[in-house]
């Protein structure tokens, strides 16, 4: 019986010490019938993301037209050292491309 009480008290202490999830300060989403969209959010702990998507026509490997969604956006957060980080990105028929101070740069060939 003492073991059950000890386990119950331990579990209660663990649950009581769980941090609250960060509050959402802003949240938006709008999708159009043709497939384009805009969305974004921001939380009280410094995390945010904003993104747009637009449908465009592109050519595949066989030069046949097809629709692709071109995505552009950015996200930000505070790293463990307290530094704000911002990553900007886009994705299209050529792939995903991101840039930011925390992303290593590819050295140029000479």
From Swiss-Prot:
Its keywords, alphabetically, are: Cuticle, Signal
Q: Which Pfam families match?
A: Chitin_bind_4
| Keyword hit for Signal | yes
* Chitin-binding type R&R domain: residues covered: 34-107
Q: Name one GO molecular function term.
A: structural constituent of chitin-based larval cuticle
The signal peptide, as residue positions, is: 1-16
What tissues has this protein been observed in?
Specific to the epidermis. Expressed in all the epidermal cells of day 3 larvae except for the bristle cells and those at the muscle attachment sites.
One GO CC term, this protein: chitin-based extracellular matrix
- Give the intrachain disulfide bonds: none
Induction (free text): In day 1 epidermis, by exposure to hydroxyecdysone in vitro without juvenile hormone.
Keyword flag Ligase: no
Q: In which domain of life is the source organism classified?
A: Eukaryota
Describe the task this protein carries out. Answer: Component of the cuticle of the larva of tobacco hornworm. Seems to participate in the formation of 5- to 10-fold thinner lamellae in the endocuticle.
Full protein name: Larval cuticle protein 16/17
Gene encoding this chain?
LCP16/17
């Amino acid at each position: 019986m003492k073991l059950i009480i000890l386990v119950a008290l331990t579990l209660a202490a663990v649950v009581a010490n769980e941090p609250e999830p960060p509050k959402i300060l802003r949240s938006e989403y709008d999708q159009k019938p043709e497939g384009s969209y805009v969305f974004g959010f921001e939380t009280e702990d410094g995390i945010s993301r904003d993104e747009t998507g637009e449908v465009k026509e592109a050519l595949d490997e066989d030069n046949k037209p097809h629709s692709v969604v071109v995505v552009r956006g950015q996200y930000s957060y505070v790293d463990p050292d307290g530094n704000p980080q911002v990553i900007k990105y886009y994705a299209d028929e050529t792939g995903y491309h991101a840039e930011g101070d925390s992303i290593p740069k590819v050295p140029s060939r000479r």
